[in-house]
Amino acid sequence: MERFLENVMYASRWLLAPVYFGLSLALIALALKFFQEILHVLPNVFALAEADLILVLLSLVDMTLVGGLLVMVMFSGYENFVSQLDISAGKEKLNWLGKMDATSLKNKVAASIVAISSIHLLRVFMDARNVPDNKLMWYVIIHLTFVLSAFVMGYLDRLTRHNH
Protein backbone atom coordinates (compact mmCIF):
# COMPACT_ATOMS: atom_id res chain seq x y z
CA MET A 1 0.00 0.00 0.00
CA GLU A 2 2.80 2.42 0.91
CA ARG A 3 4.60 1.77 -2.40
CA PHE A 4 1.35 2.36 -4.32
CA LEU A 5 0.72 5.71 -2.58
CA GLU A 6 4.30 6.81 -3.19
CA ASN A 7 4.06 5.90 -6.88
CA VAL A 8 0.75 7.75 -7.26
CA MET A 9 2.14 10.82 -5.49
CA TYR A 10 5.28 10.75 -7.61
CA ALA A 11 3.28 10.37 -10.82
CA SER A 12 0.99 13.24 -9.81
CA ARG A 13 3.81 15.68 -10.59
CA TRP A 14 2.72 15.32 -14.23
CA LEU A 15 -0.42 17.27 -13.36
CA LEU A 16 1.84 20.32 -13.45
CA ALA A 17 2.86 19.73 -17.09
CA PRO A 18 -0.35 21.23 -18.57
CA VAL A 19 0.02 24.16 -16.16
CA TYR A 20 3.49 24.91 -17.53
CA PHE A 21 2.15 24.47 -21.07
CA GLY A 22 -0.56 26.99 -20.15
CA LEU A 23 2.19 29.45 -19.26
CA SER A 24 3.55 29.07 -22.80
CA LEU A 25 0.09 30.02 -24.09
CA ALA A 26 0.15 33.03 -21.77
CA LEU A 27 3.53 33.93 -23.27
CA ILE A 28 1.96 33.85 -26.74
CA ALA A 29 -0.82 36.16 -25.52
CA LEU A 30 1.78 38.51 -24.05
CA ALA A 31 3.76 38.55 -27.32
CA LEU A 32 0.59 39.35 -29.26
CA LYS A 33 -0.18 42.24 -26.90
CA PHE A 34 3.43 43.44 -27.20
CA PHE A 35 3.27 43.59 -30.99
CA GLN A 36 -0.20 45.12 -30.89
CA GLU A 37 1.31 47.96 -28.86
CA ILE A 38 4.20 48.29 -31.36
CA LEU A 39 1.79 48.42 -34.30
CA HIS A 40 -0.33 50.97 -32.44
CA VAL A 41 2.57 53.32 -31.65
CA LEU A 42 4.57 53.20 -34.91
CA PRO A 43 2.11 55.08 -37.13
CA ASN A 44 1.78 57.81 -34.48
CA VAL A 45 5.40 58.02 -33.33
CA PHE A 46 5.97 61.52 -34.73
CA ALA A 47 2.76 62.85 -33.20
CA LEU A 48 3.51 61.47 -29.73
CA ALA A 49 4.97 63.66 -27.04
CA GLU A 50 8.29 62.45 -25.69
CA ALA A 51 6.78 61.60 -22.30
CA ASP A 52 4.02 59.56 -23.95
CA LEU A 53 6.58 57.66 -26.03
CA ILE A 54 8.59 56.92 -22.90
CA LEU A 55 5.44 55.59 -21.21
CA VAL A 56 4.82 53.26 -24.16
CA LEU A 57 8.45 52.11 -24.10
CA LEU A 58 8.23 51.45 -20.37
CA SER A 59 5.13 49.35 -21.03
CA LEU A 60 7.08 47.35 -23.62
CA VAL A 61 9.97 46.85 -21.19
CA ASP A 62 7.46 45.79 -18.54
CA MET A 63 5.94 43.21 -20.90
CA THR A 64 9.41 41.95 -21.80
CA LEU A 65 10.31 41.45 -18.14
CA VAL A 66 7.04 39.59 -17.54
CA GLY A 67 7.80 37.41 -20.58
CA GLY A 68 11.24 36.58 -19.21
CA LEU A 69 9.67 35.75 -15.86
CA LEU A 70 7.20 33.42 -17.59
CA VAL A 71 10.01 31.62 -19.45
CA MET A 72 12.06 31.26 -16.28
CA VAL A 73 9.14 29.87 -14.25
CA MET A 74 8.02 27.63 -17.12
CA PHE A 75 11.35 25.94 -17.79
CA SER A 76 12.77 25.89 -14.26
CA GLY A 77 9.51 24.77 -12.73
CA TYR A 78 9.12 22.01 -15.29
CA GLU A 79 12.67 20.81 -14.72
CA ASN A 80 12.46 21.04 -10.93
CA PHE A 81 9.04 19.51 -10.44
CA VAL A 82 8.05 17.46 -13.51
CA SER A 83 10.88 16.14 -15.67
CA GLN A 84 14.25 17.08 -17.10
CA LEU A 85 14.08 18.84 -20.46
CA ASP A 86 15.71 16.68 -23.12
CA ILE A 87 17.25 19.16 -25.53
CA SER A 88 19.15 17.68 -28.48
CA ALA A 89 22.92 18.10 -28.34
CA GLY A 90 22.95 20.14 -31.56
CA LYS A 91 20.27 22.56 -30.36
CA GLU A 92 20.85 25.76 -28.45
CA LYS A 93 20.31 25.34 -24.70
CA LEU A 94 19.84 28.10 -22.17
CA ASN A 95 22.90 28.05 -19.92
CA TRP A 96 20.87 28.17 -16.68
CA LEU A 97 18.68 25.17 -17.50
CA GLY A 98 19.21 22.37 -15.03
CA LYS A 99 21.20 24.63 -12.70
CA MET A 100 18.40 26.48 -10.95
CA ASP A 101 16.88 24.84 -7.88
CA ALA A 102 13.59 25.91 -6.30
CA THR A 103 15.31 28.42 -4.00
CA SER A 104 17.25 30.03 -6.86
CA LEU A 105 14.07 30.21 -8.89
CA LYS A 106 12.24 31.85 -5.99
CA ASN A 107 14.99 34.47 -5.65
CA LYS A 108 15.04 35.17 -9.38
CA VAL A 109 11.25 35.48 -9.44
CA ALA A 110 11.43 37.92 -6.51
CA ALA A 111 14.10 39.98 -8.30
CA SER A 112 12.00 39.98 -11.48
CA ILE A 113 8.93 41.12 -9.56
CA VAL A 114 10.95 43.98 -8.06
CA ALA A 115 12.17 44.96 -11.55
CA ILE A 116 8.63 44.81 -12.96
CA SER A 117 7.33 46.82 -10.02
CA SER A 118 10.11 49.39 -10.54
CA ILE A 119 9.13 49.86 -14.18
CA HIS A 120 5.47 50.18 -13.22
CA LEU A 121 6.33 52.70 -10.50
CA LEU A 122 8.42 54.70 -12.96
CA ARG A 123 5.45 54.77 -15.35
CA VAL A 124 3.24 56.02 -12.51
CA PHE A 125 5.75 58.74 -11.59
CA MET A 126 5.94 59.85 -15.22
CA ASP A 127 2.21 60.58 -14.95
CA ALA A 128 2.25 61.65 -11.27
CA ARG A 129 0.23 64.82 -11.81
CA ASN A 130 -2.74 62.67 -12.87
CA VAL A 131 -2.43 60.20 -9.99
CA PRO A 132 -3.97 61.02 -6.60
CA ASP A 133 -1.46 61.30 -3.75
CA ASN A 134 -2.97 58.46 -1.72
CA LYS A 135 -2.78 56.13 -4.72
CA LEU A 136 0.82 57.18 -5.35
CA MET A 137 1.61 56.45 -1.70
CA TRP A 138 0.16 52.93 -2.02
CA TYR A 139 2.18 52.26 -5.18
CA VAL A 140 5.35 53.16 -3.28
CA ILE A 141 4.36 51.09 -0.22
CA ILE A 142 3.59 48.05 -2.38
CA HIS A 143 6.87 48.44 -4.27
CA LEU A 144 8.84 48.76 -1.03
CA THR A 145 7.08 45.63 0.24
CA PHE A 146 8.29 43.75 -2.85
CA VAL A 147 11.82 45.09 -2.37
CA LEU A 148 11.87 44.19 1.33
CA SER A 149 10.44 40.72 0.65
CA ALA A 150 13.07 40.02 -2.02
CA PHE A 151 15.82 41.24 0.28
CA VAL A 152 14.61 39.10 3.20
CA MET A 153 14.25 36.01 0.98
CA GLY A 154 17.77 36.50 -0.36
CA TYR A 155 19.14 37.05 3.13
CA LEU A 156 17.42 33.93 4.49
CA ASP A 157 18.68 31.91 1.53
CA ARG A 158 22.19 33.14 2.21
CA LEU A 159 21.89 32.18 5.88
CA THR A 160 20.65 28.67 5.11
CA ARG A 161 23.32 28.08 2.46
CA HIS A 162 26.01 29.36 4.81
CA ASN A 163 24.86 27.06 7.63
CA HIS A 164 24.89 23.93 5.43
From Swiss-Prot:
- List the InterPro entries hit by this protein, alphabetically: UPF0114 (IPR005134), UPF0114_bac (IPR020761)
Record's keyword annotation contains Chloroplast? no
Where is this protein chiefly located?
Answer: membrane
- Which residue ranges run through the membrane? 10-32, 53-75, 136-155
Q: Which UniProt keywords apply?
A: Cell membrane, Membrane, Transmembrane, Transmembrane helix
Membrane-topology descriptor: Multi-pass membrane protein
GO CC, one annotated term: plasma membrane
Indicate the family of this protein. Belongs to the UPF0114 family.
Protein name as it appears in the record:
UPF0114 protein YqhA
